[in-house]
Design a protein with these regions (language model features):
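Conserved beta-strand/loop scaffold segments within soluble protein domains that form the structured core
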Residues: 4, 96-351, 361, 365, ...
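N-terminal amphipathic, basic helical "cap/leader" segment at the start of enzyme domains
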Residues: 2-115, 126-127, 131, 270, ...
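Residue-level "edge-of-site" marker
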Residues: 50, 359-360
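Generic hydrophobic-segment detector
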Residues: 28-31, 39-41, 299-300, 340, ...
Length: 393
């Protein structure tokens, strides 16, 4: 059996391509996927999937001591005609279709929520306005569950907006019927003390297209785990993300794309900027191409821009291949400091230093902001980036 090839890419960045390697995505998990929280040991920080996460700042989400208190979050759904919005109990058969919890917090969330929101777009419905889901924290502890399901050949855009203060653990499911097209923009714009841990599962149908744009700015600790699986051949998934990690913040994005069926595609691109003492960003990109997934075409990329001293990035792409019959596979990861030469060039053209810094950072994020496709959201994010940079001057 071949050994994994390790490809170092900087002091805080590493990657590997494993061809039939002994260490796989499955063996790096502390327990098999399960809906039962009792099947997962309490993490202590030495486990592979928890080694970057500051457990002491999770406010008890990881060890079962976090209990629902008062008003945790308020969820409001604004949906155009052709969309059904329901509040259901945990026995609803539509829950759990897209995937199973893979860690203790996700299982705790699944075991603890009282009501779930189910948003359904009828087959062949093509929405001209986005579905907007507002999740507003009200200072308490909450466990949530949401399902967005598209029928065959339906098309929709969903914006999930997280604001306020909360300690929230949740599961979000995306179920795409054959030929469906779904774009999801998930914005984490929490207050500075918020804690948010979530698992996002997408099940992509035959010839369906799923695009996810994850945007993370606020919060004390934010840990998101998007996961993709394919229900049939021909599915495509695009996972884009941008994050701006400020002093003292911990932002962690852990992705897993499971190419479990033939002739599917995936494209991952995440970019982050960091500034301030003890700003910490973590990006884990796991892509598994199973033996049955012939014809797979996949690529993942992570780029990080460190704006000040005292910030840290951990970036780990992993690509595991169990068949040689693929269309293409690759990954790239790089972390670098602010380009002084580029800054000098702009300043030599008469642009003030502060404005030059803004131009460079805006250019760094531009291609991902444009993936959103909603002018009001794009303008808001550009304004947030500007505000972050103003605070650092």
């Amino acid at each position: 059996m071949a050994e994994a090839q390790n490809i170092p890419a900087g002091s805080t960045t590493a990657g590997s391509i494993a061809v039939a390697a002994e260490s796989t995505v499955a063996t790096r998990m502390s327990a098999p996927p399960s809906f039962d929280v009792a099947d997962f040991p309490v993490p202590h920080g030495r486990e592979e999937e928890w080694r970057f996460t500051p457990l002491e700042r999770l406010r008890g989400l990881h060890d079962g001591t976090a209990a629902v208190t008062g008003e945790g979050v308020r969820v409001e759904v604004e949906a155009p005609e052709g969309v059904t919005v329901e509040t259901v109990g945990r026995d609803d058969a539509r829950l759990g279709k897209a995937g199973t919890p893979v860690d203790r917090i996700a299982a705790q969330a699944y075991s603890s929520f009282e009501k779930a929101s189910v948003v359904t777009v009828a087959k062949e419905a093509v929405l001209t306005e986005p579905i907007r889901i507002a999740v507003h924290g009200q200072g308490g502890v909450a466990f949530g569950h949401q399902v967005i399901e598209l029928g065959a050949f339906a098309e929709a855009v969903v914006v999930i907006d997280h604001t306020g203060d909360a300690v929230l653990a949740s599961n979000v499911e995306y179920v795409l019927g054959d030929g469906a097209k779904l774009t999801v923009v998930s914005v984490q714009d929490w207050d500075e003390k918020a804690v948010h841990v979530a698992q996002h599962n997408a099940l992509v149908g035959r010839d369906a297209s799923f695009k996810s744009v994850v945007v993370t700015f606020g919060g004390d600790v934010v840990r998101l785990h998007p996961r993709i699986a394919y229900a049939a051949p021909g599915g495509e998934a695009e996972l884009f993300g941008l994050y701006f990690t400020d002093a003292g913040q911990h932002q962690e994005h852990r992705l897993f794309v499971d190419h479990n069926t033939p002739h599917c595609k995936s494209n991952v691109a995440y970019k982050g900027a960091l500034q301030g003492q003890d700003a910490h960003a973590v990006w884990i990109g796991d892509v598994l191409i199973q033996a049955a997934a012939e014809g797979t075409d996949t690529y993942e990329l992570n780029r990080n821009l460190v704006l000040t001293d005292g910030a840290r990035v951990d970036s780990v792409p992993n690509l595991e291949i169990e068949t040689g019959e693929i269309a293409g596979a690759g990954h790239a990861s790089a972390t670098g400091r602010f380009d002084d030469e580029q800054l000098f060039y702009l300043m030599s053209r008469g642009i003030p230093q502060a404005e030059a810094r803004r131009l460079v950072v805006r250019g760094f994020f531009a291609e991902l902001v444009q993936q959103i496709g909603l002018p009001d959201v794009e303008e808001r994010l550009i304004a947030k980036i500007e505000a972050e940079l103003e605070a650092s001057v």
